[in-house]
C-alpha cells in the first residue's frame, strides 16, 4: 500500500447509528447521548495490529441536512462506510445511496454495515455461541438481504452486522474499511467469474518460483516456513500447514472441483497450481489480506506491479564517481548463477537462462543491444560462464546501475538493492607545470576503455581476442558500438574488470560529449602498422579533439605480424609519442597471445596510474616530483639533526650546571 493516510466517510440515513458506531470505536463503549454529527477523528496506526495499516486513518461522520457538505466529503473519501439499520433504510441503499454515489462519479469501495443488530447479539450471547475474539472476521455475513446488493453493485466489497450498543463487530467494520484500501480484493480476484485475475496469477507465480529454492517445482515444508517468516515474521504452525496440505489433497481428489490438478504431493510439497488455488480460496473467503501479505513482502503495489522506488532506488552519485557491485552484490550473482547451473558444467545454457530470467521481464535491453552473450566470456557451447556472468553484471552496474538494482529485485535479492552497490570516490585532478592530469585510482575495480582508430585497423579483432577467441580474417565494418568485458589479474593477485568499447559511427558524438569522456578511464588509440594511411587518422583525431590529451593514452600498433609500413603522415608514431611525452606504441597482433596480454595489463595499469601516460607530463615534471620528494626528505633530515643536536647540547649544559 502506498497511501499513508486514508479517509473513511460514514454515511447512511438519519437514525441508523452512524455517530454511535464512531463513538463506540473510539471510546470502546456505548454512549447513549451524542451530538448529531461528530467532527473528523484521526486514528493512529497503533490502533491496529496490522503492519500494513496506514499511518493515520481519518473517520468522517456525516449528516443528511447539508447535502453540499456530504457530497464534498464523499468526493474526498478513500472508502465509504455505508450504514443501515432496518427494512426502510435497507431499501434506500439501492434506490438512493448507491445511485447518489454513481451520480457524483464516486467510484470507491463500499463497506455495507447493518447496525443495531442488538436482538441477534443478545441471542448469541445468551446461547454462549458468540465469538468473543474481535480479530476474527467470521462474523462477516452474506445472508439473503446482502446477496442482491453484492450482485448489483460491484462497489460493495463486503458486508457486516454490527451493534454499537453491545460493541459487536464495530472494530471489525472499521478494519474492513481499512482493508479495502490496504488490501484491496479488486486487483486480485474477479468475483463475477470466481477466479484470480491475470496480473495476480503472474505475481503469485513469480513468488512461487523465487520461494522454490531447490527449483524442483514444489514448495516443501522448509520453503513454506521461510516464506512465512519473510512475509509475516513468524513461523508457520505445523498443524495449520498440515491442514492446508490436507485441504489441497482433498479438493483435488476424484469428483472434486480440482480433480484435474495436482495441488499437493506428499513428501514433496505444494505445487504451483496448489499455491494459486490456496490464494484463490483466501480471496473467496475474504482472507485476501493473507495474499497481500505475501505480495507486499515481494514489493508489489496495489496495481500488482513492483514498487518503482524499490526497483530503482535514488542514489546520489558524486560527479566523476562510478558505481560498482559490492561484495554482497557479487555474492548474490554468484549464488544465482550456481543455483540455475543445473548440469554443473560451468555455463548457463538457453534453458537455464530461461528459468533464471523467468521472474524478470527478460534479458536486460542493454545486453540485447550489445550482442549477449558474446560480449563476454562463453564456453565452447556458447554458454556464458561464471567469469563472464560476473563481468557482465560489473559492466551493467558501471554503465547503468538502475538496471542492476531492478534485476536484483526481480531475481529475489531480499535486502535494499543499494546494499549490493558501492560508489567509488570522485576522480581527482592534479596540476603540474600547467598540465592537468588524473590522480591515481585506488578504489576502482571496473575500468572503462574507449578504442579509437581508423576503420579496418583491427579494433574488432582486438575485442574478440580480449575474450579469448581465435582470430578471423573476415572483415565487417563496425556500424553500431561494440563492447567487450572481461576480468584480468595484475601482479599481486588483484582482480579488475576491463570494459573495451569500440564506438563505431557513434565515435564523433561520444567524443564531443564531455560527460561520456568523464566515464572513460583510458584511451586506446589504434592504428594498422601495415597500412601507411592509418596513423594519420589518430593525429587528426587529437588535433580535432585537443582535450583528449587530458585523458591517459596508450598507442597501439595493430597487425604487427604483417610488414611494417612507413606512415604517410607529417609525423611518425614514435615521434608523435615523444612529442606528447608518452610511451611509444605497443606492437600487437591478434595472433600473438603474449602481446595481447601485455596490452590489456598496460591499459589497466594506465587507468589506475594515469600520470604515466598523460600527454604533456614530460620528464621534467616527473623529475620535479622526485626532486620535490627528495627536498622534503632533505629538509626533514636537517630538522631532525638540528633537533637532536639541540637536545644533546641542553643535556650537556644541564649536567655541567648541576656539577
Swiss-Prot record:
Enzyme category, top tier: hydrolase
GO biological process: mitochondrion organization; small GTPase-mediated signal transduction
Miro domain sequence ranges: 3-183, 444-609
Topology term for the membrane: Single-pass type IV membrane protein
Organism of this sequence: Kluyveromyces lactis (strain ATCC 8585 / CBS 2359 / DSM 70799 / NBRC 1267 / NRRL Y-1140 / WM37) (Yeast)
Binding sites annotated in the UniProt record for Ca(2+) 1: 212, 214, 216, 223
A single GO molecular function term of this UniProt record: calcium ion binding
Binding site for Ca(2+) 2: 341, 343, 345, 352
Protein known as: Mitochondrial Rho GTPase 1
Binding positions (GTP 1): 12-19, 61-63, 115-118
Keyword GTP-binding recorded: yes
UniProt binding sites for GTP 2: 453-460, 489-493, 558-561
